[in-house]
């Protein structure tokens, strides 16, 4: 059971701003370790807080990927990504 990866416009813009090597690492991580697994939550961590309950984060080096996992659609929506100092602001 493979999950589909979709990116918001904001996430695509942030991905394009990264250097090519870092962007490739992030995309490879999402393809191989998140979307290909039966349960994408196994390699991530849930964000805490009243409004963040449905969002998950993944760590790739100094970068963080914020996702919304939609079980009914087998879809992982990448909402935001960036350096760990900036992504949570």
What are these regions (language model features)?
Residues 1-57, 62, 71-76, 86-89:
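Basic, Lys/Arg-enriched alpha-helical interface segments
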Residues 67:
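Short, charged interaction patches at domain edges and termini
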Residues 82:
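Residues forming the ATP-binding cleft of Hanks-type serine/threonine protein kinase domains
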């Amino acid at each position: 059971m493979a999950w589909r990866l979709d990116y918001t416009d904001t996430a695509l813009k942030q991905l394009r701003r990264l250097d090519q090597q870092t962007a490739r690492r992030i995309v490879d991580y999402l393809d191989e370790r998140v979307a290909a697994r039966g349960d994408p939550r196994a390699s991530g961590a849930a964000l805490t807080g009243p409004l963040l309950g449905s969002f998950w984060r993944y760590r790739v080096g100094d970068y963080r990927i914020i996702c919304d996992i939609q079980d009914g659609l087998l879809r992982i929506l990448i909402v935001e990504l960036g350096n760990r100092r900036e992504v949570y602001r």
